[in-house]
């Protein structure tokens, strides 16, 4: 089989530092009577996947990205953290300054194959009034975004730093009226600041939350809608507002837990029927280790050209870099 790689520029994701799709790959080129996907069309749809996926991605724009596996073979990517220096101070004229050794810690992020595909028939391509390939690319784009965002979400929610709605101290005391409010935000900021978690761009912490959670917070008079300050800097994808030095990103990807799930995650003492999880974090909170950027691929000839498979494929992994830089919140 002849494999053709078609590169394209990730122009639609300039606002997401370090994020790019890879190449478009075709399993075979064939000049038979079936409707193949010509190079120009494949290139167009690879760009379409890139564009369509962007609005759904929330976590990727804040991840620390590394692609070392493209140069060094292996199944993991290592992120190196420098430990803080502990010495230093005033000196007398005759004091000898003894250099302090630098020390590091490693965060190992395993990578795995990721992907999904869909299949269309030759008959459908020839007879449908719809743009079948365009529809397929949109479905794949949305699926890729949901998968990637879900992996980031599940990674950061592994943190052991937990707060509860309305200042409650345990899941057992949480009630159906303990919403995500100003007390919740201040509790999270206190923990992050106490842990010396660096702010994003030295300016703010980030919270990614469900729309239900942010509804109550928006009623506070100190809440600032994103459209008020949008001219001062470029907004992040999904950013809806700011409060108390925290910017808020809204997404339905954040978990909505029933009572069984709440008790499974937080213990049998929890009594609320429905719970919502949100996450706060600062700089260098979590990692995205990429061995192969996302590609749009077609599977060539199947059943004499009667079927065509189109899918996305990549190799990556996610992991926590600094757990102290992450706080999760369970609220009603």
Report residues per predicted region.
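Feature marks short, highly hydrophobic, charge-poor N-terminal signal-anchor/signal peptide-like helices
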Residues: 1-7
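Single-pass alpha-helical transmembrane signal-anchor segments in small membrane proteins across taxa
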Residues: 7-15
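N-terminal "assembly arms/tails" that initiate or stabilize quaternary assembly
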Residues: 14, 18-110, 326
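Sequence/fold signature of self-assembling virion shell proteins
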Residues: 21-62, 174-187, 218-332
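Hydrophobic alpha-helical segments involved in membrane association or supramolecular assembly
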Residues: 79, 138, 142, 207, ...
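Short acidic, glycine/tyrosine-flanked loop/strand segments centered on an H-E-D-like triad
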Residues: 101-128
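Alpha-helical scaffold segments that mediate packing/assembly in large oligomeric complexes
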Residues: 123-195, 328-332
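Extended amphipathic alpha-helical segments with heptad-repeat/coiled-coil character used for oligomerization
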Residues: 190-211, 215-217
């Amino acid at each position: 089989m002849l494999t053709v790689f078609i590169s394209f520029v990730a122009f639609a994701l300039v606002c997401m530092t370090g994020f790019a799709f890879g190449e478009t790959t075709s399993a075979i080129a064939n000049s038979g009577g079936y409707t193949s996907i010509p190079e120009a069309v494949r290139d167009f749809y690879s760009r379409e996947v890139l564009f369509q996926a962007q609005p759904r991605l929330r976590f990727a724009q804040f991840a620390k990205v590394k692609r070392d596996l493209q140069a060094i073979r292996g199944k993991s990517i290592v992120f190196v953290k420098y430990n803080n220096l502990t010495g230093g101070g005033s000196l007398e004229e005759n004091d000898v300054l003894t250099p302090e050794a630098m020390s590091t810690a490693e965060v190992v992020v395993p990578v795995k194959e990721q992907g999904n595909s869909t299949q269309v028939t030759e008959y459908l391509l020839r007879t449908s009034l719809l743009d079948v390939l365009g529809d397929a690319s949109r479905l794949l784009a949305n699926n890729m975004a949901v998968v990637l965002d879900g992996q980031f979400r599940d990674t950061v929610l592994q943190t052991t730093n937990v707060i509860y709605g309305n200042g409650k101290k345990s899941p057992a005391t949480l009630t159906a009226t303990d919403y995500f409010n100003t007390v919740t935000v201040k509790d999270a900021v206190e923990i992050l600041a106490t842990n010396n978690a660096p702010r994003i761009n030295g300016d703010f912490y980030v919270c990614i939350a469900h729309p239900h959670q942010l509804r109550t917070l928006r009623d506070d008079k100190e809440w600032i809608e994103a459209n008020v300050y949008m001219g001062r800097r470029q907004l992040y994808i999904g950013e809806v507002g700011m409060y108390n030095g925290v910017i808020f990103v809204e997404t339905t990807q954040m978990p909505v837990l029933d009572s069984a799930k709440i008790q499974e995650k937080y213990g049998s003492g929890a009594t609320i029927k429905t719970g919502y999880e949100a996450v706060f974090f600062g700089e260098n909170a979590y990692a995205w280790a990429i061995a192969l950027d996302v590609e749009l691929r077609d599977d060539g000839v199947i059943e004499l050209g009667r079927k065509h498979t189109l899918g996305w494929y990549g190799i990556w992994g996610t992991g926590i870099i600094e757990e102290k830089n992450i706080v999760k919140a369970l609220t009603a």
